[in-house]
Amino acid sequence: PYGEDVSLGQRIAGPGTELFSAVRAAFPDLKIIVENDGLHPDVALLASACALSDMRVMQTSFDYCGSMPDAYPDRCICYSGTHDQDTLTGWLNRMSRVRKDALKACLNTEEEDVWALCDLCIRTLMDSACTDCIIPMQDWLHLDSHARINAPGTLGENWMWRMHEGQFHDQLERQMAQMSMASGRQSSENM
């Protein structure tokens, strides 16, 4: 209920396959993305049973499951993080040494520089089999927690971040294009 601590809430199962079968029958071309935070295995089962794309969020899947993008299925959309999560730089800066070492092992690197690790995370996501890959601009820019969009359950500074003129520059554009081409997500003809 409004005003209550969100941690006291509970998840209630919805109608499941019956609903999506009815929606698919009425709107056969409708594209639906299932929000899958990785915490409830039945969500992935529902997406699979209904041939729906679901999402994989690197921060969530690594934090809770130890799963990395190379294990993501092809019929999904991958994200480095969502509006409700920290930026990649913020996430990496808060990460314990043990967790960071585990991430580095998964990325097959000894790299310590946080910005370089951000770029490796982005490259790993882009190289995944996922049909689509969404990287928030804050992650491309290596911005820390101050550029976080939303901190659930808080008031005040949420939804305030804006990219400033000049933050997007030629070097970043080239980096994005090169990563997109190398991962097969953009052809050189589109550059």
Segments from the language model and where they lie:
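Active-site and adjacent substrate-binding regions of carbohydrate-active enzymes
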Residues: 1-191
